[in-house]
């Protein structure tokens, strides 16, 4: 159902109010800091760049208190009309994508998001002239926000001709790979992602004999490379394909990071059903903190546990796994680490994870494997290739 024309006009007023709020004195320091970060060392930004900057700053940038400008605006305006509040609440979940224009009628587009493979009916509050150059079969880099049962163009848009199709598909494939949550907006892609991860975990267990394996530093790169080739063989077999005669072997994964580990360090590979495969340095020392025979972990073990807790790249899943498998030991380890005798994981564990890993701890679990459609898969270049 098309959005009410009054709602379309009201959305323009609300965007103006948000822009004025973003430029207000309480946000001046953070606005200046973000402007310097975005444009320091560059020539003066053009109009399109500034439009895009402010749209992203309002809808996506996290302020020091963890809120977006939009969320702070909603909190600071409790008397805002409920109709307006409903519109703005929808804008908390913008979609950034690469779109193919399928249809154009007046100020309305029907577009296909190449990243999530979903179609959207999109309006503009700037009049038909704003979409005049967005012809069918052209491509659009844009941000859209919900507006009733439709979507609204937000910020600046970049238009690409049909002749740029290969480059646009390549960019869309890279976005889906590096920002998988955008691809998983599609329920079918999400379902397929979980299926692929379950299958891949089965291959991991078949290859290593368990969902958890500890490797010595010197053998880690070789074993990871062997597993990568094993995955490819299994995937080809599952697809009913046979390796071509005299075919070149797959390019090995980049395992150069192994050389950066200290001598004697162990590497843990843990393939969690929900969290996917995690790679952990000094994993034997970490594991010994929870499984060792003594009543207390050693200082070296506590040091590694603390590093896991404070390191952003370490998933909360490994701590939840320890708590499930070794509940009493987990309580003891964190009582010792935090110097809090009353700490229990059941009562305090999730709060601890949110303190140190809030974004990951609160995130909805998503598959680590992203199934790409035929067009994107054809144009995808894996990292390091």
Positions of predicted regions on the chain:
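Extended, amphipathic alpha-helical scaffolds
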Residues: 262-385
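Short aromatic-glycine-enriched beta-strand elements
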Residues: 107-111
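A structured, charge-rich N-terminal accessory region that forms the first stable segment of a protein
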Residues: 1-82
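Mixed-charge (acidic/basic) macromolecular-recognition segments
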Residues: 139-141, 146-319
């Amino acid at each position: 159902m098309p959005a009410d024309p009054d709602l379309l006009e009201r959305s323009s007023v609300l965007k103006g109010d948000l822009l004025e709020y973003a430029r207000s004195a309480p946000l001046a320091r953070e606005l200046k800091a973000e402007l310097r970060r975005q444009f320091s060392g560059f020539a003066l930004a053009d109009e399109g760049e500034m439009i895009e900057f402010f749209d992203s700053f309002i809808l996506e940038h996290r302020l020091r208190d963890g809120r977006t400008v939009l969320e702070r605006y909603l909190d600071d305006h409790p008397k805002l009309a409920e109709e307006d509040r409903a519109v703005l609440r929808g804008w908390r979940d913008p979609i950034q994508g690469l779109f193919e224009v399928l249809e154009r009628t007046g100020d309305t587009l029907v577009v296909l998001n190449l990243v999530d493979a979903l179609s959207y009916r999109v309006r503009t509050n700037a009049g038909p002239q704003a979409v005049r150059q967005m012809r069918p079969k052209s491509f659009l880099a844009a941000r859209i926000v919900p507006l009733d049962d439709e979507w609204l163009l937000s910020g600046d848009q970049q238009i690409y001709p049909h002749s740029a199709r290969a480059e646009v598909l390549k960019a869309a494939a890279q976005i889906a790979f590096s920002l998988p949550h955008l691809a998983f907006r599609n329920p079918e892609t999400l379902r397929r992602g979980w299926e692929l991860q379950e299958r891949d975990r089965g291959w991991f267990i078949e290859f290593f004999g368990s969902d958890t394996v500890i490797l010595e530093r010197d053998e880690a790169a070789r074993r990871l490379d062997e597993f990568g080739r094993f995955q490819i063989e299994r995937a080809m077999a599952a697809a009913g394909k046979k390796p071509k005669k005299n075919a070149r072997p797959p390019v090995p994964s980049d395992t150069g990071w192994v050389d950066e580990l200290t001598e004697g360090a162990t590497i843990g590979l843990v393939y969690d059903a929900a969290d996917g495969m995690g790679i952990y340095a000094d994993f034997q020392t970490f594991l010994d903190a929870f499984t060792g025979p003594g009543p207390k972990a050693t200082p070296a073990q506590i040091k590694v546990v603390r590093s896991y807790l404070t390191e952003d790249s370490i998933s909360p899943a490994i701590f939840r796994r320890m708590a499930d498998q070794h509940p009493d030991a987990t309580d003891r380890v964190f009582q010792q680490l935090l110097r809090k005798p009353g700490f229990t994981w059941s009562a305090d564990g999730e709060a601890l994870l949110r303190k140190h890993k809030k974004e990951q701890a609160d995130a909805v679990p998503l598959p680590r494997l992203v199934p790409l459609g035929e067009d994107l898969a054809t144009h995808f270049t894996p990292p390091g290739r």
